[in-house]
């Protein structure tokens, strides 16, 4: 008998994501490459044409009613777990809708990392319950423009976590620490909401990227028109 060769169960291929020092360099346009893309997307999101479209999509997502539904036939077995999940969703320091609204920022930047902050459910910890179970304290957004780099494991096949610049509030201002301190957040500690899973890119792909050239031409044309109108108003200079 011919022996059957052993089959490798793990992944042999690579995702093919191009990186340099933890920074993703897939994009050839420097305006759309990290970290400059954050400034580009912020400017685009304020455009009078783009802003209404972004707000419409984000408000539509935020207005969707969220509920816990037990699969048919498992009502009795999962009744207690479903009730616990409902309690967790409504026992945070902020509302569930606030979390959804922040998570929709992936529609602008392509990704939205959200940290999972836990606490034991005691009233002294701010919980509505006093049973000692582990629940959620909050689901804060890890601001996209504070992500300094990504780290991988398994030879680059799986995401290990992200590094975040430590931005500490100082009075009425938010200033970055002088030491450029970074905080590593492991992947198990946050949820990563992405617009595209291509190449397992943690930054996803912003929908604004596809309209960048049209927006660039539009803004340049508006500047040229404004310059022309300004020249017409001032009239022609006459030398005496």
Show the residue positions of the predicted features.
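Beta-strand-enriched accessory nucleic-acid recognition/scaffold domains that flank the catalytic cores
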Residues: 48-60, 78
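Low-complexity, highly charged intrinsically disordered N-terminal segments
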Residues: 66-68
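Structured, contiguous alpha/beta core segments that scaffold functional sites
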Residues: 3-48, 59, 83-240
């Amino acid at each position: 008998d011919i022996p059957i060769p052993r089959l490798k169960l793990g992944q042999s291929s690579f995702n093919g994501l191009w990186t340099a020092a933890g920074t993703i360099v897939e994009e050839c346009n420097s305006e759309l490459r990290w970290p400059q893309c954050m400034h580009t997307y912020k400017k685009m999101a304020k455009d009078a044409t783009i802003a209404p479209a972004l707000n419409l999509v984000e408000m539509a997502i935020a207005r969707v009613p969220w509920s816990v539904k037990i699969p048919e036939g498992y009502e009795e077995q999962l009744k207690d777990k479903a009730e616990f999940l409902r309690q967790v969703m409504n026992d945070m320091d902020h509302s569930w809708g606030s979390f959804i609204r922040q998570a929709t920022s992936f529609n602008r930047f392509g990704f939205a990392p959200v940290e999972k902050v836990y606490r034991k459910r005691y009233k002294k910890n701010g919980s509505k319950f006093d049973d000692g179970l582990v629940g959620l304290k909050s689901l804060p957004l890890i601001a996209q423009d504070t992500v300094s780099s990504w780290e991988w494991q398994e030879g680059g096949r799986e995401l290990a976590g992200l590094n975040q610049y430590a931005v500490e509030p100082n009075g009425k201002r938010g200033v970055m620490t002088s030491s450029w301190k970074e905080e590593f957040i492991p992947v198990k500690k946050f949820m990563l909401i992405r617009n595209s899973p291509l190449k397992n890119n943690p930054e996803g792909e912003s929908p604004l990227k596809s309209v960048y050239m049209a927006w660039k031409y539009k803004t340049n044309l508006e500047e040229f028109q404004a310059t022309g109108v300004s020249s017409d108003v001032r009239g022609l200079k006459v030398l005496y």
